[in-house]
Amino acid sequence: MKFLSSDHATVPVQALRAEELEDVLDTLPSAQAAWLRATGFTGAIGDRQLISDDAGSLVRVFAGLGTPEQRRRKRFGLAEAVQGLPAGGYHLETTLEGADLDEAALALLLAGYRFDRYRATGEDLPRFTAPAGVDRARIEAIATGEALTRDLINTPANDMGPQELAEAAIALAQTHGARVAVTEGEALLEKNLPLIHTVGRAARRAPRLIDLRWGATGPKLTLVGKGVIFDTGGLNLKPGASMALMKKDMGGAATVLGLAHMIMALDMDVQLRVLIPAVENAVAGDAFRPGDILHSRKGLTVEINNTDAEGRLVLADALALADEENPDHIVSFATLTGAARVAVGPDIAPFFSTDETLATTLAQAAGEVADPVWRLPFHDAYEAMIEPGIADLDNAPKGGFAGAITAALFLRRFVEAAPYTHFDVYGWQPSPSPARPKGGVGQGARALLQALPKALDL
């Protein structure tokens, strides 16, 4: 996603906070001030008034940024005002500075996001030049990475299988000069990735491990994304209502690819590795079963108490592989548990971390970039809940308590050498909000991007 080049003729959009409205009205031409007062413009989020000249041409737009309380309750509020503007070129006029200005600039780009792959015709949209004072390249990299994440999640599973997910990673690598290796089907067993193979073997589309590498200097950062392109639940079949959104079960993979774009586009000084176990959890005669005991890459055995807890299985092999290189940090993203949604809802990305510095930095960064996260604990006392006795680990502890925590504890068993952070994301916007239409959405990636320079001492 790109800003309009500055050589285009543009209409000013004057974005006003509600608390500065009266002062601004006193500086406007009397006709414009009278018009704003007569039409009830208050500067609330979503308020918009168009000003035309005597010939009927649009010459100025006033857009509300809301009250302080409204801004706390609604991110990217400027997008609500600009989304309905006539097609054409615009530039922003505002007193916003710093992080607030960056958020507004990102809102201008994300307001133009549309997933129109399956529509006969697209729509002409308003476009903005980069606001003065922002890092244009950074905002564009973030918006483009977020758009990639959304596109991948929104694509239905019939067009987004393990192969298509691998192709998306390859295309991203070609853009940035990265390298990709893909291990497919029976080769997963040869490479000692048995859990990935087992979860995906029942599907007609073969499972894969996608391994992207970029960068030759700096700290080693490995991102691991759950790539379950569709989750039927396996033999523990999901009810229809629970299966309806399961095209988004590769939201973790989509998130790490979007974040990888941001990192590479900004040329961050890291040695980046992205690992994505890409599988479909299907039902067939060779599907894995409840009661099976499976072997993992790490050598730990796992008793299967629910085939619908498959995400942690494929992540386990990928995490074990990542840990063998002893990177400076491993971060996983996964649409892993319903318990996380019950705990914090769809907007917030809960995370777990063994690294206090990163955890503290991440919490601060999330507020700076309007990407809310919340830390949950690796609570050691719950370790016994994932130990069934007959095997080393249980993939689905009974009882229903602390589901997000027990899933994170399960994953932590496969990372011993490296500091580890895990995000349990939802990856879906259930209803439209400014700059976030209903559908796939990235969570936690922008916060992590903001935190990385301090956390990795870049």
Language model feature labels by segment:
Residues 166-458:
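A generic structural signal for tightly packed, nonpolar segments enriched in small/aliphatic residues
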Residues 1-227:
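Short amphipathic alpha-helical segment within the helicase RecA-like ATPase core
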